[in-house]
Structures are given as structure tokens and as C-alpha cells.
Amino acid sequence: MARRNRRLSSASVYRYYLKRISMNIGTTGHVNGLSIAGNPEIMRAIARLSEQETYNWVTDYAPSHLAKEVVKQISGKYNIPGAYQGLLMAFAEKVLANYILDYKGEPLVEIHHNFLWELMQRQSGAGLGVTSGFIYTFVRKDGKPVTVDMSKVLTEIEDALFKLVKK
């Protein structure tokens, strides 16, 4: 099962904070290079902005990691190759953002259908053959073919995410 309590080290958070400070100084420096160097108020504003950006990054990290862990687990269960796992991770993150974190974008059914359409566009590559729009045949590591209904996989990802956050 995916771990809910994935934590970042304080060193990671500090590195990210310093990165944001340097990026914000660089951006502001292109506009007003001389006024930054002598004005402590601008430096405080940059520090506050960087702190806010770091907080947003930290709060978005855990749900994103949770979505990726759920997809890895379900992909392993169905022997889905890595070429398709990236799309499934994007799907899980979108479901998480729109329905669990309440960003409220497109409806869940629409997200589901859009990702099925996107999967249909990627028929070449890792799949051996496609018997229907949503049914894929993949080759396992031992060489045996496995048939997977991608609509069922997407539904299982949705259910696992909703179960993990108890919504």
C-alpha cells in the first residue's frame, strides 16, 4: 500500500527554499538590479515570496507522491509497462487535484474519458496489439502476454485514491 506519511528531509526543503530565493533574486535582478542590492525591504519581500513558494511545494509533494505510489502498485498488478505508467501517474495526479484537494476542474467522467482517448492515441510502442479501444495486450517480463482493460485500470486508480483519503 502507498505510504501516506512520506516526508521530505529538512535539507531538501532548505535546498528548495534557497533555490527559490536565488530564482526570485535573479528574476527581480533583471528588472531592477541596482535597487535590490541596497534595499533590505526588497530582500525581505523576496524571502517571504520564496517561503510561500516553498510551503506550496511541500504541501503539493505528499499528494503527488501518494498518486504515484498508487499507480506503481496498480501498474505492477496488471504488468503495465513504464511507457504507459507516466500517463497513468498524470491521470492519478489530476484526479487527486480535482477531487481530493478540491481544485475543481473538469468532471471526473470527463477526465476518465480524456485519458482513455489519450491512451488510444499511444497504441504503438509497448503494447503488442490492441483488440479494442481500451483493451491492451502487454508482454510480461517472463515473455507471456497479458490482456488489460485500461478503463478498469483507471477506475481502480480512482477507487484506490478515494479509499486512501476516505472521500
UniProtKB/Swiss-Prot annotation:
It is found in: Virion. The N-terminus projects into a DNA groove. GO terms for cellular component: helical viral capsid. Keywords: DNA-binding, Virion. The lineage of its organism: Viruses, Adnaviria, Zilligvirae, Taleaviricota, Tokiviricetes. GO terms for molecular function: DNA binding. The keyword Amino-acid biosynthesis does not apply. Self-assembles to form a helical, filamentous nucleocapsid mesuring 1980 nm in length and 24 nm in width. Together with capsid protein 1, wraps arounds the DNA and maintains it in an A-form. Capsid proteins probably maintain the DNA in A-form by non-specific desolvation and specific coordination of the DNA phosphate groups by positively charged residues. This certainly protects the viral DNA under conditions such as the extreme desiccation of its host. Heterodimer composed of major capsid protein 1 and major capsid protein 2. This is Major capsid protein 2. It comes from Sulfolobus islandicus filamentous virus (isolate Iceland/Hveragerdi).
